[in-house]
Swiss-Prot record:
Belongs to the snRNP Sm proteins family. Residues 8-77 form the Sm domain. This is Putative snRNP Sm-like protein. PROSITE patterns: SM (PS52002).
Amino acid sequence: MSGPITLPTLRMMLDYVDTPVLVKLKSGLRIKGVLKTYDQHLNIILGDAEEIGETSIRRLGLTLVRGDSVVVITPAA
């Protein structure tokens, strides 16, 4: 289990609150949604979330993503 995320990283995350983001997970899943909030462990809440598959999109709605499963968070196009 990884420790808390550094303060500069947490401050950078503020720029993405209330904007669409794409989250890539260790499992290979990709989830797109509006970043609502996060904590020091990078646990994040996404609004209007969708799981993006190879050939399909699954609507998830309000979703909690555990920080230890996150590989990268990028702005969604």
